[in-house]
Amino acid sequence: MSTDRQKSFIATIGAKTTLVHFLDVVEGEEAIVYSPSFSGGFFTGRPESRDHSHFLSLRPEPRLTLYFRYTGSAYRIYIRTPGPYFGKCLSIEDGLLGAFPSDGATTFNLIDKRGFIQPIESVNTDRLDIYLQVAGSPGVLHTHRLPDSKFTYFADKNGYPHMFNFTILERNAPYLSSPEEL
C-alpha cells in the first residue's frame, strides 16, 4: 500500500494554450477590482476596492510550481514558486481559487477525462491532462468572469470544465520540513 508521501508530487501547472499564475504576476502589479456602491438602486458613493492579486488566472510565463500533498483522500496543494505566496495553499474563497494560509485549506481531487478520480501512482508519464475538483464538490474547476472585474479567474461555480496540464517535476515528494519522511 502506498504512503501519503508516495502519492505526493511537485508539478508545474498550465492550461491547453497557456500557463497559470497569480493575478499580480499576470498584471505586473496588484490586481485591484472596483465595485460601485449601490443602496436601494442608487449610487451611494465612492467605489469599493478589493485586492484580487492572490487569485489565479491565465499567464504565458513564468510557470507556477505546486506541491500536491496527498492527505489520505485528496490533495492539499502548496505553492512552491518563490515569491509572496510560497508555502500558502490553493483554496477556494467565495467560489474563486486563490492562495491562502494552509490551515483549513481546501483539498482537491485529480479527475481524468472520463470523470473518475485519477490515482497518481497509476500515471506512467510526467505530462498529465487533468481536471481539478474541490473534494466533496460535484463539479470541477473552470474559468470564470466577475461582472465588475476585467480579470479571468478559476472558480468552483458551475461552469464549463477547464482541463489543466501538469508537468511532474518530482514524485514521492516529502514536505519541505520533513525531507526524511518515508
Can you describe what each PLM-predicted range is?
Residues 1-182:
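Lectin-like carbohydrate-binding module/patch detector with strong preference for beta-trefoil
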